[in-house]
């Protein structure tokens, strides 16, 4: 029977197992670490944009759903340690495994920054802009919206659940910019 290893012994394995040290590092350290894990465990690492076979992407999809259920259970039971575990696992699987499975390692960080900029464009920079946004979004939603001043911005919320509404000057993230025409031609 194999001897059970201690946490410190397992950490030493983690620190010593670097299958491919010549791999180009990304701006997202944990994606690099998942890449190392995949290489060590014989899991796929793709380096060009791809939609792999269904069994491969379905595994990641199902794993994300499983981790979301663990997150929900941890919240329902008030277990903050399990909340942290679930959040780490969700990031590991979705941003780590998903990124490497779909060959998006070099795109994930700039794409994330583009999405962050888009999300931040939901903030109104003037009260007039907030008032116009409230009027527009209330009509679109068919229910009341309101704004609140938060720091130097005006944030428009759907009143019922305080969901942040898109500013009338919101911009959609342009994720197309991160693909070459050759990369995209494989999917059209």
Positions of PLM-derived features:
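Flexible "arm" and connector segments at domain edges
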Residues: 2-188
């Amino acid at each position: 029977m194999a001897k059970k290893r201690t946490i410190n012994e397992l950490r030493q394995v983690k620190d010593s197992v670097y299958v491919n040290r010549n791999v180009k590092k990304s701006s997202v350290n944990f994606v690099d670490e998942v890449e190392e894990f995949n290489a060590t465990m014989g899991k796929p690492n793709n380096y060009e944009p791809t939609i792999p076979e269904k069994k491969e992407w379905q595994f990641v999809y199902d794993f994300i759903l499983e981790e979301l259920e663990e997150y929900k259970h941890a919240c329902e039971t008030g277990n903050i340690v399990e909340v942290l575990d679930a959040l780490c696992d969700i990031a590991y699987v979705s941003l780590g495994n998903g990124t490497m499975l779909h060959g998006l390692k070099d795109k994930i960080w700039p794409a994330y920054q583009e999405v962050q900029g888009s999300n931040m464009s939901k903030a109104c920079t003037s009260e007039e802009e907030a008032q116009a946004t409230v009027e527009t979004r209330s009509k679109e939603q068919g229910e009341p919206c309101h704004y609140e001043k938060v720091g130097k911005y005006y944030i428009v919320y759907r009143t019922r659940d305080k969901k942040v509404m898109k500013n009338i000057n919101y911009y959609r993230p342009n994720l197309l910019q991160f693909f070459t025409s050759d990369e995209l031609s494989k999917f059209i």
